Amino acid sequence: MPASKFLIASCSAVLLWAAVLGPHFARPARADETCNSPYLSTLIRGKEDYLYVWTLGVAGMGDGFDKLVTLDVRPGSRTYGKVIAQASVGERGEAHHVGFTDDRRFLWAGGLDSNKIHVFDVGANPAHPRLVRTITDLGARSGLHGPHTFYALPGRMLIGALSNAADGGGVTGLALYNNQGEYIRKYAMPVDSGGDGYGYDIAINPARNAMLTSSFTGRKNYMRDLGALIQDPAAMQRFGNTMVMWNLKAMRPEKVFAVPGAPLEIRWSLREGDDWAITSTALTSKLWLIKKDAAGQWQARPVADIGDPAKTPLPVDMSISADSKGLWVNTFMDGTTRYFDISNPEAPKQTYAKKTGAQVNMVSQSWDGKRVYVSSSLLARWDKRGKDNEQFVKLYGWNGKELT
């Protein structure tokens, strides 16, 4: 199929997370993006109907506020490729990531600046999500700031924050809420045994009683102009360089891995029996493998470069295939979408690359791997200027050899 460019004209075109999903009770055939929590009530493997886009408000565009936008991605539909619904939150708060509750009825969406969590009902009418709740007590109850990752647990939501409410630095933690939006408790990121206290993503492998977290940077950095940040040596030292393996049942840190260069997204292999995960480092442009060694101990080590690390392509989002043999990686600075053959995770090989924009960030694929969604924009003050400040969502077909 030809690449389709879905522009969001009546609201912010900044896309920071793409969900190629639809709740299972709307129609029999639905699809899951492969990064979803394993605790979703049904991991549905079909064809997606709607694309949920959590967009960043831009002054002078629509109402100027952050909003959840719904795109129709049903081929043959008269509204295919068009915005069919918008749910505004009435403010700008640095919209970023979202995540489903385990029952798939609600989508939680965070503001990295506002520190608010907006809850949308996507179950009652999947084509027209509705804002039903805004959670405002994250800072007061947990001391955390910048809700980033929303990871479904049975009846609960585990939230990975980027910063703290005290000094805006990178020392942070995890907050646990129930599905009704009630705060339960906080888990601090470790600052001993080699830990730096930083946080970013969450990924769980229930079969191994294993939870991995990664690390990025605090509000002082992510809300700063990128050009000025890069020119500040002290600020550039304030990025995470660790990952943490947690005992899932005990919710206790068990091992800190040294992973220099801000490890971001984490993807566990989806093949039954596998015991490895993969991540990428934003500042050093490497793929890292987390796997047990011959002695049964978890270890982390670099296994491949992403582009030319000397040019800092800045890998951001990634998407693992359902058979865990392929990995899509977007690099922000050079606007490239790359495909790695990871059939041997010890030695990933880049087999394809395509420039898909000036500043690409998010990448999501359908469960069957035949459709790949790419979007632009990273953070409001990190995005490029002028003509390179592209705001889009693109749908590509993937035939195993090229994006079309």
At which residue positions do the language-model features occur?
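Short coil/turn segments that connect the beta-strands within blades of beta-propeller domains
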Residues: 47-49, 103-105, 154-156, 207-209, ...
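Short loop/turn segments immediately following beta-strands, especially the blade-tip
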Residues: 71-78, 119-129, 180-182, 289-299, ...
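Loop/turn-rich, solvent-exposed surfaces of beta-rich toroidal or solenoidal domains
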Residues: 310-387, 393
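Asp-box/WD-like beta-propeller blade repeats and closely related beta-sheet repeat scaffolds
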Residues: 123-206
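Beta-propeller domains
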Residues: 101, 194-343
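Short, conserved, GDST-rich strand-edge loop motifs in beta-rich repeat architectures
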Residues: 46, 52-63, 160-170, 214-238, ...
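Surface-exposed loop and turn segments in beta-propeller and other repeat-based domains
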Residues: 82-94, 132-143, 186-197, 253-262, ...
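Blade-loop segments of beta-propeller domains
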Residues: 80-149
